[in-house]
Amino acid sequence: MSNQEYTFQTEINQLLDLMIHSLYSNKEIFLRELVSNASDALDKLNYLMLTDEKLKGLNTTPSIHLSFDSQKKTLTIKDNGIGMDKNDLIEHLGTIAKSGTKNFLSALSGDKKKDSALIGQFGVGFYSAFMVASKIVVQTKKVNSDQAYAWVSDGKGKFEISECVKDEQGTEITLFLKDEDSHFASRWEIDSVVKKYSEHIPFPIFLTYTDTKHEGEGDNQKEIKEEKCEQINQASALWKMNKSELKDKDYKEFYQSFAHDNSEPLSYIHNKVEGSLEYTTLFYIPSTAPFDMFRVDYKSGVKLYVKRVFITDDDKELLPSYLRFVKGVIDSEDLPLNVSREILQQNKILANIRSASVKKILSEIERLSKDEKNYHKFYEPFGKVLKEGLYGDFENKEKLLELLRFYSKDKEKLISLKEYKENLKENQKSIYYLLGENLDLLKASPLLEKYAQKGYDVLLLSDEIDAFVMPGVNEYDKTPFKDASHSESLKELGLEEIHDEVKDQFKDLMKAFEENLKDEIKGVELSSHLTSAVALIGDEQNAMMANWMRQMGQSVPESKKTLELNPNHAILQKLLKCEDKEQLSAFIWLLYDGAKLLEKGALKDAKSFNERLNSVLLKAL
């Protein structure tokens, strides 16, 4: 087979250009990424050796070998893992299908330090090697395959694939280093980077180097060169070590390697269980949200091992989806090594591990919540996701309610439900909340005025998830939740009914509102729960449906709503006496537009609003 030339997909070209010219704030991470890829290849081979009958007799000792040539300025990373065939090379090193490149490019912020930290999270770590290499040669042979292949590229838009000779399965990557990055072809540089990022990769990493010694003295001194190969990492599964052997620094360094994240985690939970079930878990709560946290196809951050043998990192059932930001490891002593994904989903052992793990993680989040300042660091990125648990995790619902924080009418900061309940007024029977599209509009809602008169606080819920989960939350600590916009809640305020004589007094004016706004509203009502506002657009049934549709990602169709009027307001009292139909119509539309502004924060037809306003002002002056 002669050399076949291929062109990188457009997005990969963009990525390579960024790698070469922009994302150079922390170049050494290229080695972390290549070692991590090698470790993944060894994990996959280990799993196949346990589950594939054809590979059960394979005699191999999994390891990673690093070597360099300082004269030629090359660095080589070699593993004896699963290897790749020609299709794998094209798919993984040339196209966007498995690279996550598109997501990476869309997440870039322009901050070189932050952007370089994203590399590993998006599965584009291989390309980071072009930060230091002017040319890369990959030689690889897939396990149980007779043919090996070479992949060559200088990162300038094209790559070549050809057949080559390679005895053992696995992958060997040789980097031809740029002059300014030739220091990576040195024993001490490689040793330092591996110890910093890959100390607890669960496979031995060997470094081959030439050791130079001098014997004799003066003219008789001789230089003796000896090639040596030394293991430079602990190769121990950190989660299997005793807590007493580990320092905070060890946990944090392992996280940065494991999660491909340069930032430190907020917290970690290391737990070993012995008894009827034996397993170890190590979970991390990150300080930043994963890029795909709100995507349907998010990647699980938890790896499952059985007796230190990697099983999967693609099972979203290991933890509930509302904890999808958690990274870590579950290592079971009791699961069968050849467990399939279908068996995993029905396995009682794993179900018990999952249940206990959730409780451990929630307890750690509760511990974080004791310190308001630190809890803000957790709640800002992960609070919305945590709320999702109210919808499906009934077992931990009470615990989740304790952990949630809300804005309210009376407080300028996020508060807990416990704080809200501690400030309940003597006759207050419920916890009131108001749903809306954003916090500013909620704070301006005329509905809040009557609650304020009673001294009742109202929770202001503007997250999209709120409309989905809150109607299903019946109570907290025996106190019911109620939507502040619902008629039942307004009755609890003890408001007086609108008397018949008042309705008769406003009958003609209400008819004028209905005639002018017949294409906009479904009706007009007099309301006793408005204080300073003249009018309010309200329709609790349609509002609930709209909130649900937004949460489900559907567009909300325009629907006619009820316009509520405040019969005690001076403006309406004066409109009762207005005999100029043209002027009355302008006032009616202005009041309706004002109510729309309070509801939406914007008007569909701002031009007409402005014309009506100018007309009224002109007559008033």
Swiss-Prot record:
**Which residues does the annotated region (B) include?**
342-547
InterPro entries with a match to the protein in the record = HATPase_C_sf, Heat_shock_protein_90_CS, HSP90_C, Hsp90_fam, Hsp90_N, Ribosomal_Su5_D2-typ_SF
UniProtKB keywords: ATP-binding, Chaperone, Cytoplasm, Nucleotide-binding, Stress response
UniProt-listed GO biological process terms? DNA damage response; protein folding; response to heat
Q: From the UniProt record, which GO molecular function terms apply? A: ATP binding; ATP hydrolysis activity; ATP-dependent protein folding chaperone; unfolded protein binding
SMART domains xref list: HATPase_c
Q: Name one Pfam family in it.
A: HSP90
Residue numbers spanned by region C: 548-621
Question: What do the Gene Ontology cellular component annotations say?
Answer: cytosol
**Location relative to the cell:** Cytoplasm
The annotated region (A) lies at: 1-341
Q: Which HAMAP family match?
A: HSP90
Question: What family is this protein classified in?
Answer: Belongs to the heat shock protein 90 family.
Task: Outline what the protein does.
Answer: Molecular chaperone. Has ATPase activity.
**Subunit comment:** Homodimer.
Q: What is this protein called?
A: Chaperone protein HtpG
Q: Which gene encodes it?
A: htpG
